[in-house]
């Protein structure tokens, strides 16, 4: 029985991944900073294949390296080994240009989106190197491909750095483990969750520009759709430095090509 650990997985894309992994026969360890959300997520997971899979929840702040080590230790103690570790935890940035962001807002984005991935990868790599195998996935996002937009500068900066870090760590793994520890990227594309309409978990809604909504309606997908594609490919992957991509160039081109015939409205704006 294999085990997956997912950070930031009490809701949204992380929880959808957890459910799909459990449906696929994995023991699942979810983690989040919000204990109430975590308990609700655990109850949902425990109803999936209860006869032959297990779920565990661990409160974890990814900006705290000790929390991440305790997350690994809890998973290893419960299930023996950790086969897949996913750095999923992330926050959006307030919809403001850099000159209007506070130092606290800047630090929070970098601490969660970048440092959280670095700290999580460090813990997972050490554990997987010791056990002799494993896969580490870090979630890419807007900015990973050098895309730029006012209001997303700090988020994009963090995600671009995550891409460089992950690819460089994959090279280190090749040198140190011969690729036994596979360090990879997960590129889900545009997901329709409250992540894109709220910043830092704030209840205040971000009203997206109409142009942005139009693009999201063409290219976006619900996380349930995305995990049906990416999770089986993560499970089957045997390559170090792999990139599991949902919104490929071909898929994006097809969406734009058919946008005039297939109307999609994720924001309920149709009159």
Task: List each model region and its residues.
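C-terminal helical subdomain
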Residues: 185, 203-262
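Canonical Rossmann dinucleotide-binding motif of NAD(H)/NADP(H)-dependent dehydrogenases/reductases
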Residues: 1-29
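The beta1-alpha1 cofactor-binding region of Rossmann-like NAD(H)/NADP(H)-dependent oxidoreductases
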Residues: 35-36, 59-70, 103
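Catalytic loop of short-chain dehydrogenase/reductase
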Residues: 135-161, 166-167, 171-175, 190
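Conserved glycine-rich Rossmann-like NAD(P)H-binding loop of the short-chain dehydrogenase/reductase
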Residues: 24-41
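A short, exposed helix-loop element centered on a Lys and neighboring polar residues
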Residues: 121-122, 167
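Substrate-binding pocket helix/loop in short-chain dehydrogenase/reductase
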Residues: 96-98, 102-107
């Amino acid at each position: 029985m294999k085990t997956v650990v997912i950070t930031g997985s009490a809701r949204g894309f992380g929880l959808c991944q957890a459910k799909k992994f459990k449906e696929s026969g994995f023991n699942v360890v979810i983690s989040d900073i919000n204990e109430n959300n975590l308990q609700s997520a655990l109850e949902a997971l425990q109803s999936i294949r209860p006869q032959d899979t297990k779920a565990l929840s661990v409160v974890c702040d990814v900006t705290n390296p000790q929390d991440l080590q305790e997350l690994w230790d809890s998973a290893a103690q419960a299930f023996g080994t950790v086969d897949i570790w996913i750095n999923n935890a992330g926050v959006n940035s307030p919809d403001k240009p850099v000159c209007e962001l506070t130092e606290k807002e800047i630090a929070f984005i970098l601490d969660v989106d970048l440092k959280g991935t670095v700290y999580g990868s460090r813990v997972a790599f050490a554990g997987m190197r010791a056990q002799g195998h494993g896969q580490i996935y870090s979630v890419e996002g807007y900015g990973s491909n050098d895309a730029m937009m006012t209001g997303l500068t700090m988020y994009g900066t963090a995600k671009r750095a995550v891409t460089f870090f992950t690819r460089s760590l994959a090279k280190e793994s090749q040198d140190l483990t011969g690729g036994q520890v596979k360090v990879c990227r997960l590129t889900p594309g545009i997901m329709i969750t409250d992540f894109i309409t709220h910043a830092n978990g704030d209840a205040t809604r971000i009203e997206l520009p109409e142009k942005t909504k139009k693009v999201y309606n063409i290219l976006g997908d619900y996380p349930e759709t995305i995990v049906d594609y990416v999770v089986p490919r993560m499970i089957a992957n045997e390559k170090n430095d792999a990139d599991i991509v949902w919104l490929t160039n071909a898929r994006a081109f097809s969406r734009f090509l058919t946008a005039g015939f297939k109307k999609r409205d994720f924001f309920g704006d149709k009159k």
